[in-house]
């Protein structure tokens, strides 16, 4: 994804740390696109896809006490993209993948601080809305989930 890796003058590659302004831009775009994907998924998600999302959520919940943040992050990624793929909008999913790649180095900073304050309530609300095929509620809860996480990262960037 564009901007995910930068070339240094000495030909080394580095992953750039995003500024607060860059994170705000990323937040606004991700909230819009991930909200759209979730809204669309609510009307199309199959029982098998929903079961997969619920299984991924159970893995996240089971990992919380262990403090294995890398594993949690992998399951969170699986859960989100299972939802986004249910939108049946592959071009949109590819856009979201690129945005996640751009944010990945900062996303590790969500652990453990932010994730200990967030007990998965927005994720649970999203899953419940998907189960009801309630597109508006699913979109709102996903937008809040993504927005809150990025707001936390913006706060960290502003404090530096």
Q: What do these predicted regions represent?
A:
Residues 130-137:
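Short acidic-aromatic low-complexity motifs
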Residues 26, 47-108, 119-125, 137-148:
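Conserved amphipathic alpha-helical segments that form helical-bundle/coiled-coil interaction surfaces
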